[in-house]
A protein has these predicted regions:
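Basic, amphipathic alpha-helical segments enriched in Lys/Arg and hydrophobic/aromatic residues
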Residues: 349-416
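Domain-level cores of phosphate- or acyl-group-handling catalytic modules
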Residues: 196-254
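Short acidic (Asp/Glu) and glycine-rich catalytic loops that position anionic groups and cofactors
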Residues: 9-15, 46-50, 88-91, 306-311, ...
């Protein structure tokens, strides 16, 4: 029978292949993820807090196990529920979950379908507790809230999906807030496709800002957002909670008129040279019709190379820095696009294929937690020469390592690939995990 299953290569008929290798896995690096998740208390917290509205009196595969299975699968790039069927007896997955077989695709799908508003609140609790633990290891010097939205494409009749005119595509339009320094995903909310960027942004950010202000009273807080988030309600939330902000304003004739004094200076500077780049900065106090009081607006006027027209940038801010420093601070929010790209490409944030919006919201939150677990892993314990790498590269180099399980009466030994070129980084990461001293209580 083995002869029938063997396949010879046309390039070399003396080389044969089959999938009868036995107790092998290609995901030995997940042992590091498991060790880290245990060390920072995530596994214990999930078992304590996460439970769906399940009426069954007995489950072979309980909710916390299903939860962690999908987190590990997401980190290993097995995004689909169907992948569970192929991984049922994978020696690495069964070892890190401590069970003889994984939950099947129907079990995982039913698990997601049981999720509701209550489980969304449980995600909030889990993420708050995990932030406290992670900050006990390495506390931030200041917090930089980067606020943005993105499009998650849909291709069916999902509840809440719609055509979004900004992106010119159908989908959901979730709201995201990242730590602009570390890349941690601080908050995530799935919204209908028709929602405008700033819709509910103040209610979205207020609990998060208050959490940091309450737990870290002396921590400097900053917020950045593009013109889609230019709403007085968000300004006031920041001002009440002593959170400095720099939010772009859409250009209009009033703002351009107020900046005219600097535009005239730029015309004088460039009148004999309309080819080279030129720039000037300024500021003024401004009160829009919907604002309760005047606010500081800084601006930049630049003349691009080989262009005659000026380009204006207006930022409303509570920061006291010089205009050019505020502009430079705001422009740093471009890093957030990389965080969003990492979430969508590396952790499949677009896994919103259920007909139910609430189920899709829970799926998104689970993928967001997988993103955070890896991001904490990367910046706290990953080998130093790998900490700037993206998830796909780390998967290739450190997570997708072949291993053979050798079982004895008392132990299971995983014999990893002898020719792995990243043994040093593997052991360095493991040593870093052992050196962590998180405050779990």
């Amino acid at each position: 029978m083995n002869i029938l299953r063997d396949t010879s290569l046309e390039s070399n008929p003396y080389l044969k292949i089959n999938f009868d290798g036995g107790d092998l896995s290609s995901d030995a690096g997940l042992l590091l993820i498991k060790e880290f998740a245990e060390k920072i208390g995530l596994v214990k917290i999930v078992y304590q807090l996460f439970k769906t509205n399940d009426t069954a009196t007995f489950r072979l595969h309980i909710d916390p196990e299903n939860f962690l299975q999908m987190v590990y699968q997401t980190i290993a790039a097995y995004f689909e529920d169907d992948c569970s069927d192929e991984l049922t007896v994978d020696p690495i997955f069964t070892a890190i979950l401590g069970k003889p077989a994984l939950a099947s695709q129907p079990t995982i799908s039913r698990f997601f379908n049981r999720m509701d508003d209550t489980t969304l609140k449980q995600f909030d609790q889990i993420e708050k507790l995990m932030r406290d633990i992670v900050y006990s290891i390495k506390a931030p010097e200041y917090m930089l809230f980067d606020l943005d939205s993105t499009l998650l494409n849909t291709y069916g009749n999902q509840e809440g999906e719609a055509f979004n005119y900004h992106y010119q595509a159908r989908g959901y339009h979730p709201l995201l807030c990242f730590d602009g320094i570390t890349g941690d995903l601080l908050k995530l909310e799935l919204r209908d496709g028709t929602h405008y960027c700033s819709n509910g942004a103040d209610k979205f950010m207020e609990p998060l800002i208050r959490e940091f202000r309450t737990k870290h009273p002396s921590l400097p807080l900053y917020l950045r957002g593009d013109s889609g988030f230019a709403s007085p309600e968000l300004y006031e939330v920041c001002e009440v909670n002593a959170c400095e902000y720099a939010i772009r304003l859409k250009q209009n004739s009033t703002l351009v008129a107020l900046a005219e004094y600097k535009a005239e200076d730029l015309r004088q500077v460039t009148k004999h040279n309309m080819v080279d780049y030129a720039v000037t900065y300024g500021e003024f106090m401004y009160q829009a019709g919907t604002w309760s009081h005047p606010r500081r607006v800084v601006f930049k006027i630049e003349k691009p190379v080989n262009q005659f027209l000026f380009v204006y940038t207006f930022i409303v801010t509570t920061m006291e820095s010089e205009p050019h420093k505020v502009i430079r601070f705001y422009c740093g929010r471009g890093k957030m696009e990389n965080f969003i790209k990492e979430g969508k490409d590396g952790f499949d944030f677009a896994a919103v294929s259920s007909k139910s919006k609430i189920v899709n919201a829970n799926r998104l939150r689970l993928h967001g937690l997988a993103y955070n677990l890896f991001n904490w892993f990367r910046r706290l314990v990953l080998a130093a020469n790998m900490r700037k790498l993206r998830i796909n590269t780390v998967r290739l180099k450190l997570l997708k390592v072949a291993a053979r399980a050798v079982r004895s009466a008392r132990y299971t030994t995983f014999k990893l690939c002898s020719s792995c070129p990243y043994k040093k980084e593997f052991y360095e990461t493991l040593q870093n995990i052992r050196g962590l001293q998180p405050q779990l209580e």
